[in-house]
Every structure is written in C-alpha cells, then in structure tokens.
C-alpha cells in the first residue's frame, strides 16, 4: 500500500488552518477529532472480542501475550505489558512488549529500526517464541516491515496472531489471523499517527489485556483482586477491595490481609466463608483462583 494513499496519511479538512486559530480553538479542534476515536473502536468490538477469546485460550494453555510494534505502537505495547504484573499479579513474562530498536527505542528514535524485517524475527526468537504464544502486531499504518515479518514468523511457528492497524486492507491486517482495524481517519497533524491512531491502539490494548485478566479470574465484580501492594496507595486499595467485596470493615479487612500475606483473593474468601488463610487458599487453588467459583460451588 502506497503511503500517500493511506487514510492515516491523509489531510484533515477540520485542521487545515489550525496554525491560525486561538489556543482554545486549537484545543477544540483536537478534542473534536479525539471524540471520534471511541466510535471507531466501537465498530470493531466483535473483532476485539474474538481476539480476547483466542488470547485467553492460549494463555490458559501456558502461552504468552506478545506485543510487537515500532515507535509509538511499540511503546504502547510496552506500556500495556508493564502494567499487568502490578495490577493483576501476573508474572512479568506473561505479557511481553517488544519494540523495534530495543530498550533504547522506548525514549529515542532509532533510525531504520522499523524497516528491519530481521529485527522483528530476531526479537521474537530472543524471547523463545513458541506455538502456544499469541503475537499481536501493532502498526498504525499497517505497513511496518518489523511487524509484518514478526507476524509471518509467528504464523510459521503455529502461533495465533492479531494485527492492529488503522488502514483497511493493510499488510498487517492481511498477514495476521485476526485483524482489528479501527478507522480513525486523517490526523489533526497530517501523518502524526501518535494522535488518533495511537489513542485507538491504546483503547484496543486496554481491552485485550483487561479482557484476558477478567477471563482469567483476576477480577471479581469489578475489583482487581490480584493487585500487588507495592506502595502505600496499593496497600490502602487492597483494604478497600476486601471491604467492598465482603462488606467487612477496614480492621477486619486488614487483619485478613495480614493473615494471608496480603493476597486479596484469599482474604475475601476468608471473610465470606469464615475460613482460615490455609483453607481459603486451598479452595481457591481447587477452583483455579476464581473467587466466583469458590462462592458459587461451595
């Protein structure tokens, strides 16, 4: 697909004279364009749901969720991956973000990195990609060689693959088994796909990882019951989670958390089923860590 024919490279009539307007009007133009992004994502919700189900199936079987991107797309994948361990208590290697150019590229532009097909393949080889893993290629343009080659390699291994782009019929979309293509239109600043396209990608990634965690029993109601308390704010959040899930008071919640080494799931089952920490943990283990199953089946 030629660059000049891509929707993400088109000219936006709404911002044609944005350099001549007041600061407030400039903000309004950008905000009006941003409002269209959730609607674009809404139109591809069935595709997102299908991807979540596949990701969950693979991860449940011992696989990983691998994000692969360059520039903004790569950084968004790393951002999403890095938030999963503290939020949901998963091991750091379960959700992995790879960016063209490596760690240096997180904060700096690396010349030619996104054009390296070898880079995409080698980065996946370096994490010992297996057929159990799911590779999600992220590229606003849908034409990034680093991402396309990575998806091709992943499919050769037998991996399930997802392609996220903002141009219909792109190489990323056609290479991946599952395509998620929110069409956000031309950017306010022509070609600056870190804006609307980047926002759309972030919304999609939020759904992929959050959907995976919900289906994996990491959420009870709407509470992040596997949160790891790495700071004072999260210690307080743990107490509030146990309170909200059980109806107990703060003192009871804290006592239960202390008794089970600050595991929210165990504390919740302890309070709701009137169990000690060991028995609560045992029952959770018997039901794969799903609080709902412990409560519904016992």
From Swiss-Prot:
<dbReference type="GO" id="GO:0046348">
    <property type="term" value="P:amino sugar catabolic process"/>
</dbReference>
<comment type="subunit">
    <text>Homodimer.</text>
</comment>
<keyword id="KW-0456">Lyase</keyword>
<dbReference type="GO" id="GO:0016803">
    <property type="term" value="F:ether hydrolase activity"/>
</dbReference>
<comment type="pathway">
    <text>Amino-sugar metabolism; 1,6-anhydro-N-acetylmuramate degradation.</text>
</comment>
<feature type="domain" description="SIS">
    <location>
        <begin position="55"/>
        <end position="218"/>
    </location>
</feature>
<comment type="pathway">
    <text>Amino-sugar metabolism; N-acetylmuramate degradation.</text>
</comment>
<dbReference type="GO" id="GO:0097367">
    <property type="term" value="F:carbohydrate derivative binding"/>
</dbReference>
<comment type="function">
    <text>Specifically catalyzes the cleavage of the D-lactyl ether substituent of MurNAc 6-phosphate, producing GlcNAc 6-phosphate and D-lactate. Together with AnmK, is also required for the utilization of anhydro-N-acetylmuramic acid (anhMurNAc) either imported from the medium or derived from its own cell wall murein, and thus plays a role in cell wall recycling.</text>
</comment>
<dbReference type="InterPro" id="IPR040190">
    <property type="entry name" value="MURQ/GCKR"/>
</dbReference>
<dbReference type="InterPro" id="IPR001347">
    <property type="entry name" value="SIS_dom"/>
</dbReference>
<dbReference type="GO" id="GO:0016835">
    <property type="term" value="F:carbon-oxygen lyase activity"/>
</dbReference>
<dbReference type="InterPro" id="IPR005486">
    <property type="entry name" value="Glucokinase_regulatory_CS"/>
</dbReference>
<dbReference type="InterPro" id="IPR005488">
    <property type="entry name" value="Etherase_MurQ"/>
</dbReference>
<dbReference type="GO" id="GO:0097175">
    <property type="term" value="P:1,6-anhydro-N-acetyl-beta-muramic acid catabolic process"/>
</dbReference>
<feature type="active site" description="Proton donor">
    <location>
        <position position="83"/>
    </location>
</feature>
<dbReference type="GO" id="GO:0097173">
    <property type="term" value="P:N-acetylmuramic acid catabolic process"/>
</dbReference>
<protein>
    <recommendedName>
        <fullName>N-acetylmuramic acid 6-phosphate etherase</fullName>
        <ecNumber>4.2.1.126</ecNumber>
    </recommendedName>
</protein>
<dbReference type="InterPro" id="IPR046348">
    <property type="entry name" value="SIS_dom_sf"/>
</dbReference>
<comment type="similarity">
    <text>Belongs to the GCKR-like family. MurNAc-6-P etherase subfamily.</text>
</comment>
<feature type="active site">
    <location>
        <position position="114"/>
    </location>
</feature>
<keyword id="KW-0119">Carbohydrate metabolism</keyword>
<dbReference type="GO" id="GO:0009254">
    <property type="term" value="P:peptidoglycan turnover"/>
</dbReference>
<dbReference type="Pfam" id="PF22645">
    <property type="entry name" value="GKRP_SIS_N"/>
</dbReference>
């Amino acid at each position: 697909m030629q660059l000049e024919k891509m929707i993400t490279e088109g000219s936006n009539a709404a911002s044609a004279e944005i350099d001549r307007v007041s600061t407030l009007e400039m903000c309004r133009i950008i905000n009006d364009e941003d409002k269209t992004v959730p609607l674009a994502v809404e139109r591809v919700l069935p595709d997102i749901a299908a991807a979540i189900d596949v990701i969950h199936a693979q991860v449940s079987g011992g696989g990983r969720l691998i994000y692969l991107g360059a520039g903004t797309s790569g950084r968004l994948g790393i951002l999403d991956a890095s938030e999963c361990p503290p939020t949901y208590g998963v091991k750091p290697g379960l959700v992995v973000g790879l960016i063209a150019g490596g760690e240096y590229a997180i904060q700096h532009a690396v010349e030619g990195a996104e054009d390296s097909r070898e880079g995409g393949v080698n980065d996946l080889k370096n994490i010992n990609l297996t057929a159990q893993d799911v590779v999600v290629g992220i590229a606003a343009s849908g034409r990034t060689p680093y991402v396309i080659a990575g998806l091709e390699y992943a499919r050769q291994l037998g991996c399930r693959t997802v392609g996220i782009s903002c141009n219909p019929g792109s190489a990323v979309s056609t290479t991946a088994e599952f395509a998620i293509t929110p069409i956000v239109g031309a950017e306010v600043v022509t070609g600056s796909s870190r804006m609307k396209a980047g926002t759309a990608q972030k919304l999609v990634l939020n759904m992929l990882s959050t959907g995976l965690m919900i289906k994996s029993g990491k959420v009870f109601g709407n509470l992040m019951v596997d949160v790891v308390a790495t700071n004072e704010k999260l210690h307080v959040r743990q107490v509030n989670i146990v309170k909200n899930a059980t109806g107990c008071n703060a003192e009871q919640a804290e006592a239960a958390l202390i008794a089970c080494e600050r595991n929210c799931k165990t504390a919740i089952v302890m309070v709701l089923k009137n169990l000690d920490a060991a028995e609560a943990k045992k029952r959770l283990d018997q039901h794969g860590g799903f609080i709902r199953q412990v409560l519904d089946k016992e």
